């Protein structure tokens, strides 16, 4: 039974405390291992894990179940159990004046030191939304956002009523626009009780969502229309109601509202924060914003040993010294391994789409007839990622290096027309291109160990974890000069032999193709050297970027140096432990700002 008079910390004690953050509630629409559609899920899982294991914080991740609590394998691996004494119930009032009842609960589990709370439906009307397995669907997404906000708000009230206020967070970290209602709601509920719990909002990707105040209000998501001390610029603080902030200040922008209410705003790269987020939101985040990089903890040695054991054992006896080289892995991947993708049932991806390109009658992906330099691309199938630009570049690259292969692992979206168009375009190059929808885990990793160059032709890229996955496995990146790519990839044209790839202007297919040809040739020359062969065919003449042509003239093994640069850059700067330390610094500032706000 709830405690009659729950004992809460006094305002005075909360204002004066200087203790560091120790308990964090993460709010996210997705999380790797449970329900993931893209880099957001990877970021939330990686940051939560390092904060829990390396920084020893008590971290809890809250997200809609998306029906994952019904999966026996997930229940077992996360130890999920229903919270028997917690129920979130009530009604939401629609713009039509009708009541919509909801009845929600939560499943709790843990993994790698992190607690996970999955909001689920306890009746058919609520389960229809919270347990919908499609992570992103227009109507369902907004329903999940609202119901999750209601559920976590009720959970905070539940802990207080049960005399368990010590389980409440020291800090709330909301990830992306989907979690603005939940983050603001819990912050508001705790502030009403004198608890200065800071809200950190990370903008992973701007969406420009515009909604009426009714959506966020107490009628629907649950945010009360009470006065709030809002800092509208660096020096000025105004007291406005939440509806005024939403409508008059933020012009019904969900993301602007979140940034205004948050005590601290972060994004995943400094470039994206300053050039995109700040431009969109305005000066209000000056003095309360900073970036937190994403990370990658892949261990190439472990990956290689496990992949070789699983995928490569059959041809090991044919190797001279028993140890496969990169070109051995590549030949095996292109001429044998990719045929396994449809035969085996490991493919994973949204909606389990498996309509890969060049399929054989038995449903498997058709292998290439020969080996060749390999360009790899991975990521979501969306206009943002520029898959169409890479497909445009194929004939240009092929004219210079006819044997080049392009392998694209793409996570499909709900845009069936885009999927169909992409597959049709790839089929025009049967000797050069394969598109694989979803991920076959072992083949996906093998492709990183086997590739020569990684392509990242994004039109916009807040960070781009895939660039880290490429570089840690020794793949130089040809990427567009946008967002986080400019901070992860060191341009060979500008930094010489210390570079990790080439940056090209966005939407410039000619430059993209030219850079791919130049970097592929550098890697081919290095491979010839490792094999003890000479450049009798004069392929070095294909290097079209003159600064790199001069570097290769001095060092024919430049490719090996670039691969080493790639691995070192990720290992030294972009591990999740690095991201965790950045987050702790941002949390400290957010806590100080929240305490100052409460004192006003």
Residue ranges and their predicted role:
Residues 2-600:
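Catalytic cores of nucleotide-sugar-dependent glycosyltransferases that transfer UDP/GDP/TDP-activated
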């Amino acid at each position: 039974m709830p405690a009659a008079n729950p004992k809460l910390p006094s305002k005075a004690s909360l204002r004066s405390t200087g203790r560091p953050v120790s308990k964090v509630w993460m709010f996210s629409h997705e999380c790797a291992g449970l329900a993931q559609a893209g880099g957001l899920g990877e970021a939330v899982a990686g940051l939560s894990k390092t904060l829990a294991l390396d920084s020893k914080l008590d971290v809890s991740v809250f997200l809609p179940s998306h029906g994952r609590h019904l999966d026996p394998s997930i229940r077992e691996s996360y130890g999920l159990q229903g919270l028997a004494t917690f129920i979130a119930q009530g009604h939401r009032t629609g713009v039509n004046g009708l009541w919509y009842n909801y009845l929600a609960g939560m499943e709790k589990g843990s993994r790698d030191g992190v607690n996970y709370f999955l909001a689920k439906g306890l009746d058919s009307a609520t389960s229809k939304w919270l347990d919908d397995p499609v992570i992103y669907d227009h109507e369902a997404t907004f329903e999940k956002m609202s119901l999750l906000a209601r559920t976590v708000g009720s959970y905070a009230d539940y802990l207080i009523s049960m005399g368990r206020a010590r389980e409440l967070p020291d800090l709330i970290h909301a990830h992306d626009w989907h979690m603005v209602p939940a983050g603001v709601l819990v912050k508001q509920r705790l502030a009403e009780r004198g608890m200065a719990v800071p809200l950190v909002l990370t903008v992973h990707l701007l969406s420009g969502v515009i909604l009426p105040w009714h959506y966020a209000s107490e009628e629907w998501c649950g945010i009360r229309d009470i006065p709030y001390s809002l800092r509208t610029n660096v020096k000025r603080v105004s007291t406005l109601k939440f509806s005024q902030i939403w409508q008059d200040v933020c012009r019904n922008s969900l993301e602007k509202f979140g940034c205004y209410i948050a005590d601290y705003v972060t994004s995943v790269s400094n470039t994206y924060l300053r050039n995109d987020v700040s431009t969109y939101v305005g000066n209000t985040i000056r003095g309360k914003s900073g970036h937190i990089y994403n990370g990658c903890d892949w261990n190439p040695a472990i990956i290689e040993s496990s992949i070789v054991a699983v995928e490569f054992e059959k041809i090991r006896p044919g190797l001279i010294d028993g140890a496969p080289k990169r070109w051995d892995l590549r030949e095996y991947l292109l001429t044998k391994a990719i045929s396994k993708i449809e035969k085996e049932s490991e493919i994973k991806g949204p909606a389990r789409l498996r309509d890969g390109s060049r399929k054989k009658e038995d449903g498997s992906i058709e292998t290439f007839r020969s080996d060749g330099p390999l360009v790899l691309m991975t990521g979501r199938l969306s206009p943002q990622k520029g898959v169409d630009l890479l497909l445009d570049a194929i004939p240009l690259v092929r004219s210079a290096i006819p044997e080049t292969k392009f392998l694209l692992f793409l996570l499909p979206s709900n845009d069936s027309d885009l999927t169909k168009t992409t597959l049709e375009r790839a089929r025009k190059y049967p000797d050069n291109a394969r598109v694989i929808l979803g991920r076959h885990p072992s083949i996906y990793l093998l492709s990183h160990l086997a590739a020569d160059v990684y392509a990242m032709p994004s039109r916009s890229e807040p960070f781009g974890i895939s660039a880290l996955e490429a570089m840690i496995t020794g793949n130089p990146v040809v990427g567009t000069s946008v967002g986080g790519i400019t901070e992860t990839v060191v341009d060979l044209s500008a930094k010489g032999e210390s570079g990790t790839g080439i940056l090209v202007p966005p939407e410039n297919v000619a430059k993209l193709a030219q850079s791919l040809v130049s970097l592929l040739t550098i890697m081919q020359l290095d491979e010839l050297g490792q094999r003890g062969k000479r450049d009798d065919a004069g392929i070095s003449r294909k290097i079209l970027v003159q600064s790199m042509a001069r570097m290769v003239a001095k060092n024919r093994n430049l490719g090996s140096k670039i691969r080493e640069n790639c691995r070192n850059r990720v290992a030294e700067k972009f591990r999740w432990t690095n991201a965790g330390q950045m987050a702790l610094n941002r949390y400290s500032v957010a806590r100080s700002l929240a305490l100052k706000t409460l004192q006003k």
